[in-house]
């Protein structure tokens, strides 16, 4: 389905605006969003200090209250800290942890296997791998994804590399052991045609029903209609990345009347 990579709204003081956050989540759920991904890239996790990060995860899990699944951003380039956040998210009742590849350190493929194995071993929380080499400088190989998919707690991938040859090879190797979600709103339909499970979506912040409908049409095997709908919103999707995410999407939400802060 369509999981929203939800923004984090802030007050003018720089604190998280939980009152507005709640309204945004209610709107998302009412308009078809299938899951909430909190403290991801779009949620500015890398700009939150530890206390803010943990508070946002805990609050979101409590507020959503099982209406839809909650996926908590728990990744870090520090393996020990990623383990801490993953355990914390599990204690809060998150349904999965989204764990980005270790950035800046630029580890090897063997290092990626060691990093994610340690995280997946720390508790029973399902782990969704997050491949976004344009931000991290690190990219999984298909062989690495295959090795990681053997772990019972690693069962998902947010694919934001844009490399369909890599994805096709990985999906062929991993089969049902790895569920793949697009990390790019302009690639939902082609990825789902290969067997992908949907999208972790920036678009959903401003058009949740549209993102949901695109994925549902794919599930219903109505790919021409899904492609037509995706292309209908291509210019909007493109505009959401005219500057570094989440600047454009927060501006778009502001224009729609949401109080999102800086």
Enumerate the language-model features and the residues they cover:
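GST superfamily/GST-like fold recognition
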Residues: 253-255
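Active-site beta->alpha loop and helix N-cap motifs at the rims of alpha/beta catalytic domains
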Residues: 1-4, 8-137
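Flexible C-terminal active-site loop/helix
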Residues: 258-262
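Catalytic alpha/beta core domains of metabolic enzymes, predominantly
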Residues: 121-122, 135-241
